Design a protein with these regions (language model features):
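Glycine-rich phosphate/diphosphate-binding loop of Rossmann-like nucleotide-binding domains
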Residues: 1-33
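N-terminal low-complexity segments that are often proline-rich with Ser/Thr-Pro
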Residues: 133-166
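Short, ordered loop/turn segments at secondary-structure junctions
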Residues: 4, 29-31, 58-59, 80-83, ...
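N-terminal beta-loop-helix "entrance" segment that forms/cooperates
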Residues: 26-48
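C-terminal binding/interaction regions
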Residues: 4-8, 85-145
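Short glycine/serine/threonine-rich phosphate/pyrophosphate-binding segments
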Residues: 6-11, 34-38, 57-66, 85-87, ...
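Structural motif
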Residues: 25, 51-53, 73-77, 99-104, ...
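Glycine-rich phosphate-binding loop
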Residues: 41-79
C-alpha cells in the first residue's frame, strides 16, 4: 500500500486472501516518500517467494507502475478513492507506458476484493490442466460462474467455445 490510510479498503483484499488460505505480506511504502524501500522490497520479492504483487495507491498512484518497473512478477494495481473519487488514481494506474504492465482493478473496496481474486487466479494458472478443475484455492464455480452466464452474454456466442471454462 502506498499509505497506511489505504488499509481500511485493503482489508477487504486481506480478508479475501485469508478466506482462500493464501499467504501474503503487507507492506506500506510510498513510491514518492519511500522510493528506496519500495525498490528494495520489490527487488527481493521473488527471493521471499512472492509470485504476484498487489499494489494499492491513491491520487498520483505511482506505486503499481514503480513496482512493475522493478519486477517481472504480475502486478495488480488497486486505485484508492481521493478528492476526485479515485478517477485520478484509476487513470494513473491504467495508463502505464509500454513495457510496464499493470493489471488495473476498479476503485476502492470492489477493486481490493477483485485484486485478491485475480491474484488467486494467477496463482492457480499452473494448476489448470485441460478439462480438469483447479486444485485447491477457489472452486470452479467461484472462478467462472456469473449470474448472466446462462444466457445472453456475448461470451456465450464466441466462435471457439473450447477456450471457455465449463
Amino acid at each position: 500500500m502506498g499509505s497506511a490510510s489505504d488499509s481500511e479498503v485493503m482489508n477487504h483484499c486481506v480478508e479475501t486472501l485469508q478466506e482462500h488460505d493464501i499467504d501474503f505480506d503487507i507492506v506500506v511504502a510510498s513510491a514518492h516518500r519511500d522510493p528506496d524501500k519500495v525498490r528494495d522490497w520489490v527487488l527481493n520479492a521473488k527471493q521471499r517467494g512472492n509470485r504476484v504483487i498487489i499494489a494499492a495507491a491513491g491520487m498520483a498512484a505511482a506505486l503499481p507502475g514503480v513496482v512493475a518497473a522493478y519486477t517481472d512478477l504480475p502486478v495488480i494495481g488497486v486505485p484508492m478513492k481521493s478528492d476526485l473519487n479515485g478517477l485520478d488514481s484509476l487513470l494513473s494506474i491504467s495508463q502505464m507506458p509500454r513495457g510496464v504492465p499493470v493489471a488495473c482493478m476498479s476503485i476502492g473496496k470492489h477493486g481490493a476484493v477483485n485484486a485478491a481474486l485475480f491474484a488467486i487466479r494467477i496463482l492457480l494458472v499452473n494448476e489448470y490442466k485441460k478439462d480438469e478443475k483447479p486444485q485447491g484455492g477457489l472452486q470452479q464455480r467461484d472462478l467462472f460462474e456469473h449470474p448472466w452466464k446462462k444466457g445472453g452474454h456475448p461470451w456465450n456466442q464466441v466462435r471457439n467455445p473450447r477456450h471457455l471454462p465449463r
